[in-house]
Amino acid sequence: MKKILMLIELSERNAIGRPVRITIRELADALNTSPQTVLRLLAELEDEGLIERKTEGRRTYIEILPKGLDFLQDICDKISNALSKGVIVGEVVSGLGEGAYYVRQYEPLIEEYLGFKPFPGTLNVKILFPKTVLDAVCNIRPVIIPGFVKDGRTFGDVKAYPVMIGGIKGAIVVPSRTIHPPRIAEIIAPVNLREALKLKDGDRVRLEVIQ
């Protein structure tokens, strides 16, 4: 893990395609470790052909070699693959109580586009993994619930992402205009999810996005 962090730190210092002057103390401070550990890590990375290190007097120049770049790319690919599997882990939180109103307004369209009559309310989940709602669904094509005008008020489009939570099919809904921060997912379902799954604030939940 420390070698991976070292390569990431070097890449952030632009040691790609050219040698960059870096002090051992800078690396030690950045990685919150000792200069001795930094020297050992650099020696190991050099022995593995991941970096090239040159010393001129008291100056140290380091470059990530193609093998090191391939190693970093492989890690990025694995992380991207993990994030694209559509698994979301979050924590149940209380909402502002406005979900019921909006679900009622969109109810006929939700039935038409998602195939179920929604319970008038949403389950709010604070995303713990991945970082935001959009990160969780970035590779998923949403169901677009079209906006409409009612009693002179405009209701915008809503993006819906079908999910399974505790064996119940529902959907994450992302309104075109929302007051929720990007780490809060609003989930609708045919039932009251809090009651059906016996959930309370702080409970950990797992959602699987249906692709």
From Swiss-Prot:
The keyword Transport does not apply. GO terms for molecular function: DNA binding; magnesium ion binding; nucleotide binding; riboflavin kinase activity. It holds the Pfam family HTH_Crp_2. Its EC number is 2.7.1.161. It catalyses: riboflavin + CTP = CDP + FMN + H(+). Residues 1-85 are annotated as: H-T-H motif-like. FMN binds at T178, E186. Its cofactor is Mg(2+). Coiled coil: none annotated. CDP binds at G95, L96, G97, E98, G99, A100, V191, N192, L193, R194. Keywords: Flavoprotein, FMN, Kinase, Magnesium, Metal-binding, Nucleotide-binding, Transferase. Pathway: Cofactor biosynthesis; FMN biosynthesis; FMN from riboflavin (CTP route): step 1/1. InterPro entries: HTH_CRP (IPR012318), RibK_CTP-dep (IPR039063), Riboflavin_kinase_archaeal (IPR023470), Riboflavin_kinase_CTP-dep (IPR023602), Riboflavin_kinase_dom_sf (IPR023465), WH-like_DNA-bd_sf (IPR036388), WH_DNA-bd_sf (IPR036390). The keyword Magnesium applies. Residues 86-211 are annotated as: Riboflavin kinase. It is an enzyme of class 2 (transferase). Mg(2+) binds at T122, N124. Binds 1 Mg(2+) ion per subunit. Signal peptide: none annotated. One of its GO terms (biological process) is regulation of DNA-templated transcription. Belongs to the archaeal riboflavin kinase family. Catalyzes the CTP-dependent phosphorylation of riboflavin (vitamin B2) to form flavin mononucleotide (FMN). This is Riboflavin kinase. It comes from Thermococcus kodakarensis (strain ATCC BAA-918 / JCM 12380 / KOD1).
